[in-house]
């Protein structure tokens, strides 16, 4: 059943069009047969940039959507009826080592946007640098409300934008700080 229109019949398509009224980072997912469709990958992220290109300007802007799947060993098809017992954690539907590195230059101002459409929270941790949370589901955070962090918790259905200056050269880990998630690709 549809929320604002009739459901889309199997095998048919529908183009969603809307006016992006405010800048920010947003997630989407279905509201019909939600768990099955999300288990098959029907979810995503989009960024609406501000009209003023100088507002909240950064040199590098990365976006990650956290997903979780239940897939039997040797299989490629997720179990679509799993509600909480997931065994594969992904970033933009990719598992380590298939995740591209976040490449930046020394001195770059870097933003990383993380959206969580899994069924658990993820304490996202950055090695080698401190960051501030500059954005949430509600929009940009006021500069006076920010403080240095190395880990931020991204709860179910939430989005966080973090920013830092790349001051220390090298390869630095960026991961979920739940040990059993890092053992399985996150």
Describe the function of each predicted region:
Residues 1-186:
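Copper-binding active sites and cupredoxin-like electron-transfer domains
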